[in-house]
Amino acid sequence: MKFSTILPILWANCCLCMIIPDFDGIVRFIENIDGTRSVRAGEGLGQHDPGNFHTEHQHVAHKTEFLPYRYVIVFNEDISLQQIQSHMQVVQKDHSTSVGKLTENDAFWRVISSSVSSKSQFGGIDNFFDINGLFRGYTGYFTDEIIKIISQDPIIKFVEQETTVKISNSSLQEEAPWGLHRVSHREKPKYGQDLEYLYEDAAGKGVTSYVLDTGIDTEHEDFEGRAEWGAVIPANDEASDLNGHGTHCAGIIGSKHFGVAKNTKIVAVKVLRSNGEGTVSDVIKGIEYVTKEHIESSKKKNKEFKGSTANLSLGSSKSLAMEMAVNAAVDSGVHFAIAAGNEDEDACLSSPAGAEKSITVGASTFSDDRAFFSNWGTCVDVFAPGINIMSTYIGSRNATLSLSGTSMASPHVAGILSYFLSLQPAPDSEFFNDAPSPQELKEKVLKFSTQGVLGDIGDDTPNKLIYNGGGKKLDGFW
């Protein structure tokens, strides 16, 4: 066991709402009792406005930035690759024909003409994704004519208009000495007491922690050389964090002074641009990358490899596609922690917080209350410190900053997932008996959390605060 004395969300919150127009033969608003709106495929007639969604609950309290004529198309699970290839070939051919009919006065032409050099190249399929065969689809720009045809193909599960995801700064320039102390103690700290973080020596060793965010300053000295770049998903972006959000989250997961899992390997997967903005499809591609990397690491049977975790401190309004991508990654063995959001509303109304197989994290305060901004509800699984959290930042090799948000709470849980995975016997040990699945570890983490201590929670929100065991024997955990 070790302890460290601690020196005295930015939730990637989109603040969006899905504006869902009627679209001839494709979607129709259905008003729900709770005031949300649903849309169904293949119903209704209406005037075109770029937007074709199929989802169960589209929250309309935020302002959504949807991308005109750009869509995420998801296949049914039970179709073959041959069917997928045939469908995509037909779509691309038909789209080229459709584009050839356009004039310079058409809205589709105006929307995307700045990004291509000739009319024959306008739009069409630009990305295919496949998360371990469990979640497959593609993205692209399509005309009204073609998106209607796509939506009516029986092998298509649903079509969702591409939307943006963003981060929303909520920084506080104050010392924040309490977060690590709280997750390693059952009792809340008292004002003025000495604070310490209690943990086992392994502390994430053998585990790879992926941070899907704005990138990471891998040269920051507090990462001790354990941070590296994995992928840059947004087109024409670079392997650097010019925002700071990703570096801060990574520090909470695994940096020397501010991290929960101080020996974990940290991998940057840039899904948000340096300005803090991104798209649902880029997040999905990032999840696909993480899943493939995890599967490859598992196949190598490295005796030191103990598993993969991932953190998503970002969000948008409801996106069934993004939540399905997360669930597919979890089913493939990746342990996910996700920020609940900062709107002081039901977390089930946003994505990916509503993904059922990940761990969705709300933010708590020093006094063990729900943070005033933290989302709540049945989609929240557990709470973690999210007010005035000190961590690594950009600007110099030893820069730090104190931030608040569910973005800061979620990495505490990602770090604890990495921490517990590292405490398992090595794969080549006689005591090794299969690493816990994400579902098994989720159940153990939630059961082991500190129960019933949080205030201002609400009747339908789990009253659970994350806990790492305090460096003690964990017989009660396993």
From Swiss-Prot:
One of its GO terms (molecular function) is serine-type endopeptidase activity. The active site is at 213 (charge relay system), 245 (charge relay system), 407 (charge relay system). GO terms for cellular component: endoplasmic reticulum; extracellular space; fungal-type vacuole lumen. It is an enzyme of class 3 (hydrolase). Its EC number is 3.4.21.-. Residues 70-167 form the Inhibitor I9 domain. Gene3D superfamilies: Peptidase S8/S53 domain. Disulfide bonds: none annotated. Serine protease with unknown substrate. This is Subtilisin-like protease 3. It comes from Saccharomyces cerevisiae (strain ATCC 204508 / S288c). The gene is YSP3.
